UniProtKB/Swiss-Prot annotation:
Sites where the protein binds tRNA: Y18, F69, N71, N117
Keyword RNA-binding on entry: yes
NCBIfam families assigned: pth (TIGR00447)
UniProt record similarity statement: Belongs to the PTH family.
Keyword field: Cytoplasm, Hydrolase, RNA-binding, tRNA-binding
HAMAP family assigned to the protein according to its UniProt record, in alphabetical order: Pept_tRNA_hydro_bact
Source organism of the structure: Vibrio vulnificus (strain YJ016)
EC top class, as a word: hydrolase
Catalytic activity: an N-acyl-L-alpha-aminoacyl-tRNA + H2O = an N-acyl-L-amino acid + a tRNA + H(+)
Top-rank lineage group of the source organism: Bacteria
Compartmental location: Cytoplasm
Name listed for the protein in its UniProt record: Peptidyl-tRNA hydrolase
Cross-referenced Gene3D superfamilies: Peptidyl-tRNA hydrolase
Length: 196
């Protein structure tokens, strides 16, 4: 059974100084999908972000990387969703995940924000609807909560970045499966993947 996903969002902080930081892992998924489909994301002020449109398995999918700061991501998502009449249940948000190690990613539907400011604002701006899909890109944890801010805004060492890149690539392939064959088939594949 195919899955109706109409909007894929990659959470990020804007600007070149943040582009390669762990907190921007969600945006890497959208950038890779745009690259694979040979489109250029365009800045759209009314949606507070970089946007694009692709067709996957005959289904239109809008792409968004908010250019607000992370803690205001919901403003961009809500603006685009409202304009195109996209329901929260038709949105997939890709984001960095401290609770998964680098090299691992997981799909999830619904749930809380787990302390992630981008997810927190998204839930709030979608009227506290938590039923959107998430693509959680593992970045690992620094070991202590006081180190989290510096960790997510830091760049991964090369050995770790190669795991993140491989995970993003596999996530894009599994997104294709999700749209064509549904969540459980996509989970079956992505959740057994581990970048080496």
């Amino acid at each position: 059974m195919s899955q109706q996903i109409k909007l894929l969002v990659g959470l990020a902080n804007p600007g070149p100084e943040y582009a390669k930081t762990r907190h921007n892992a969600g945006a890497w998924v959208v950038e890779e999908l745009a690259r694979v489909h040979n489109i250029t994301l365009k800045n759209e002020a009314k949606f507070y972000g970089l946007t694009g449109r692709i067709v996957m398995n005959g289904q239109e999918l809008r792409l968004l990387i908010p250019t607000t700061f992370m803690n205001l991501s919901g403003k961009a998502i809500a603006a685009l969703a409202k304009f195109y009449q996209i329901q929260p249940e038709e949105i997939m948000v890709a984001h960095d995940e401290l609770d998964l190690p680098p090299g691992i990613a997981k799909f999830k539907k619904g749930g809380g924000h787990g302390g992630h400011n981008g997810l927190r604002d998204t839930i709030s701006k979608l009227g506290n609807n938590k039923e959107f899909y998430r693509l959680r890109i593992g970045i690992g944890h620094p070991g202590h909560k006081d180190k989290v801010a510096g960790f997510v805004l830091g760049k991964a060492p090369a050995s770790e970045q190669s795991l993140l890149d491989a995970t993003v690539d596999e996530s894009v392939r599994c997104l294709d499966i999700l749209i064509k064959d549904g969540l459980s088939k996509a989970q079956n594949r992505l959740h057994t993947f581990k970048a080496e």
